[in-house]
Amino acid sequence: MKKYFDFSHFKFDLLGGLTAGIVALPLALAFGEQSGLGAASGLYGAAFISFFAALFGGTNTQISGPTAPMTALSMVIIAGIVQACEGDISVALPMILAVFVLAGLIQVLMGFLSLGSYIKFIPYPVVSGFMTGIGVIILITQIPPTLGYNSGQDEQLIEHFMPHGEELILDRILSEEAEEGIMVLDDFKETVLRASAITEIQKMDEAKVLASNAGKGVLGSLRYIERALLNVNWMELVLALLTILIIYGFKRITTAVPSTLVALVVVSSGAYFGGLDYRLIQEIPMGMPKFNYEIFTGIDFKIMSPFILSAFTLAMLGAIDSLLTSLVADNMTKTQHKPNQELIGQGIGNTIAAFFGGLPGAGATIRTVVNINSGGKTRLSGMMAGVFLFSIILVLGTIASKIPAGVLAGILITVGIGVMDYRGLKALPKMEWSEKIILLTVLILTVFWQLVFAVAVGLVMAA
């Protein structure tokens, strides 16, 4: 135990962990909001993964939590399961979290099977195309919220989906009664009565869900970009642009304080205390998140089975993301990480986070670099980052719920710009034709088809 925990650098670990936790806070909120599960899910993921991946992992200075690639893939999985559940997030949630749990367990298994050492052999064009594709996805999907547009609040679009909404309600009534055996002629009156009792409010609620789902993802964002431009909410746009301006501008003044945090605090405070009319992020409950027992009881395997492959992809992506960051940490600290132990730690962190409703994550490069530069030296630094984020959940959930959605959209725009692999794009003219084709194919498939299959196709092409 003495070797496992080294308290001789505790002062430095505390400072490094707190600083990394501060950097992680706005990103966690933004990734949670982007995913579709709400800002709280990002915060829960950041806290649990940071603590447990550090406790059980194999990279002493690694700071883990939701990352851009993991969130982009999670967003696709969440949207797919919600759509399969006819837009009912309460029905979909146990299956979404079950996929996240499965991904974590796969990572643990990968660690025990000593597969961590082989991740580094993935060809660079595949990784480059995928990372740039992730950046493009984030940029495209954040255009509507930056403009203050939400398809689920577009009255004309909701009106358009009203007939379809009524059809879905009728389908559910018929399905329920077929299961109950109420399809004989004598009992058919009950079906007619239930159908005639459908209210306009019920139709409206169903149409809102349909409109909201139609605007999600890359294709949904592109489909309604014209409507977004015609219905710009100037307040949201100003808040997003001001956030972007501060993030890039404050870095020129000093890097001692994270510019993302400065933007979050300054713009959110100005909007709140200025009494501005802005759209809030989803509410963040104060107190410890509840354990989701529904993962064991609320699973429909017919709906979930197509997403099992997604769990493998999520596990593989998290492994790549984490171990690449581990290499960065090694170069900075002149140490050697343990790749298989790191996968076990990441898997445990993701599994526990999922049981409490958190987004999956991985080793985060920027947060890890900040931790090292701020003095972090041992696994205690990552655990301290997790403790800091837990304190935010316990004490400041209500305050964090006042953050404008436009601010998080602005933060995500800068994340999308930052995650793209410009080195790979600049090297394209000098690459061999085979590498160019692989990089561009993975990039296009990542953005417009399926993240789940993009890397697999790239690996097959590179073989």
Where are these regions (language model features)?
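Transmembrane helical cores of multi-pass ion-transport proteins
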Residues: 1-463
